[in-house]
From Swiss-Prot:
PROSITE patterns: RIBOSOMAL_L11
Keywords: Methylation, Ribonucleoprotein, Ribosomal protein, RNA-binding, rRNA-binding
Annotated function: Forms part of the ribosomal stalk which helps the ribosome interact with GTP-bound translation factors.
Protein family: Belongs to the universal ribosomal protein uL11 family.
Protein name per the record: Large ribosomal subunit protein uL11
One GO BP: translation
GO-annotated molecular function: large ribosomal subunit rRNA binding; structural constituent of ribosome
Cellular component GO terms, alphabetical: cytosolic large ribosomal subunit
Database matches in SUPFAM superfamilies: Ribosomal L11/L12e N-terminal domain, Ribosomal protein L11, C-terminal domain
Quaternary structure and interacting proteins, as annotated: Part of the ribosomal stalk of the 50S ribosomal subunit. Interacts with L10 and the large rRNA to form the base of the stalk. L10 forms an elongated spine to which L12 dimers bind in a sequential fashion forming a multimeric L10(L12)X complex.
Pfam families: Ribosomal_L11, Ribosomal_L11_N
Modification comment: One or more lysine residues are methylated.
Organism: Levilactobacillus brevis (strain ATCC 367 / BCRC 12310 / CIP 105137 / JCM 1170 / LMG 11437 / NCIMB 947 / NCTC 947)
Domain of life: Bacteria
Length: 141
């Protein structure tokens, strides 16, 4: 018989930098997870994605064992990296802060494809373009 899921914890943690310190430690402690076991496994799995924020979904079972799924970095993080800026615009409709090309958008859409509910790459590109516009980025090309 399959183990019964007791809790699901969703976090966004910098790749390879999970520590027992807040906010990771308290969130995992409340769920009853072995914090050191999770941090070691997460850091090992995400070591190749250094510098990115990685969303993770942790399933905690009734016997306090756990497993987790790492997702692709958020579209906003990938867009900021592609544009070379720290953050988006506070007034995206009037104040444009950066420009991304269609090629960059396509590359981000292909990266995010497994986590998006898009039928094809073109639909995923439209989603990423919408995120870019809402951050005050101009899409060229």
């Amino acid at each position: 018989m399959a183990k019964k899921v007791a809790n699901v914890v969703k976090l966004q943690i910098p790749a390879g930098k999970a520590t027992p310190a807040p906010p990771v430690g308290p969130a995992l402690g409340q769920a009853g997870i072995n914090i050191m076991g999770f941090t070691k496994e997460f850091n090992a799995r995400t070591a190749d994605q250094a510098g990115m924020i990685i969303p993770v979904v942790i399933s905690v079972y009734e016997d306090r064992s756990f497993d987790f799924i790492t997702k692709t970095p958020p579209a906003a993080t990938l867009l900021k990296k592609a544009a070379g800026v720290e953050h988006g615009s506070g007034e995206p409709n009037t104040n444009k802060v950066a420009t991304v090309t269609k090629d960059q958008v396509k590359q981000i859409a292909e990266t995010k494809m497994q986590d998006l509910n898009a039928a094809d790459v073109e639909a995923a590109m439209r989603m990423i373009e919408g995120t870019a516009r809402s951050m005050g980025f101009t899409v060229e090309g």
